[in-house]
Design a protein with these regions (language model features):
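Beta/alpha (TIM)-barrel catalytic core signal, keyed to glycine-rich beta->alpha loops juxtaposed to Asp/Glu
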Residues: 1-131
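The conserved 3'-phosphoadenosine-5'-phosphosulfate
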Residues: 134
Length: 134
C-alpha cells in the first residue's frame, strides 16, 4: 500500500514506483484525497467544523496546499469536474497506480468519486498539476 496524492507524490514516486512497475506489483493508494483536503472543501481553519478529520487535514492547510488547490480548481474548471474528480483522475494516471482508495459518506459523494474514472486529463492539465505538487 502507498499514500500518493497531489500533495505528497513523493510518497510513492521514485524507487517504490520503479520496483512496482518492474515487478508488476499492483498499487492501491490510500488517503488518495489527503483526508478530504483535495476535495476543496477545506480552505481555511473555519472549514474544519465540517469534519471530524481535522487533525489529518490541518497539515495540508498551508501555502503549498493552497497552491495545489488553486491548480486543481483551474483544471477542474477546464474539464467541468470537481476538485475530487481531478485529484483522483491525476492519481489514476500515474504509472503503476492500479486504483486509489477514497471514502464516501453518502451516495452523492460516491457518484462524484466514480465520475473520476471518466475524466481525461490532457498533457497541459497534467503539467499544471505536476508543477503545483512538485
Amino acid at each position: 500500500h502507498a499514500t500518493s496524492t497531489l500533495y505528497e507524490p513523493a510518497d510513492f514516486e521514485g524507487e517504490l514506483q520503479t520496483m512496482c512497475l518492474r515487478e508488476n506489483i499492483v498499487v492501491i493508494t490510500y488517503f488518495s484525497l489527503a483526508a478530504g483536503f483535495l476535495t476543496g472543501k477545506y480552505r481555511s481553519a473555519a472549514d474544519f467544523a465540517k469534519s471530524a478529520r481535522v487533525p489529518g487535514i490541518k497539515k495540508y492547510l498551508n501555502p503549498r496546499g493552497l497552491k495545489i488547490l488553486d491548480a486543481v480548481d483551474a483544471v477542474a474548471r477546464g474539464c467541468n469536474a470537481t476538485p475530487a474528480q481531478v485529484s483522483l483522475a491525476w492519481l489514476m494516471s500515474r504509472p503503476g497506480v492500479t486504483a486509489p482508495i477514497a471514502s464516501a459518506t453518502n451516495l452523492n459523494q460516491l457518484q462524484e468519486i466514480l465520475r473520476a474514472t471518466q475524466i481525461g486529463l490532457d498533457a497541459e492539465a497534467m503539467a499544471t498539476l505536476d508543477q503545483a505538487s512538485a
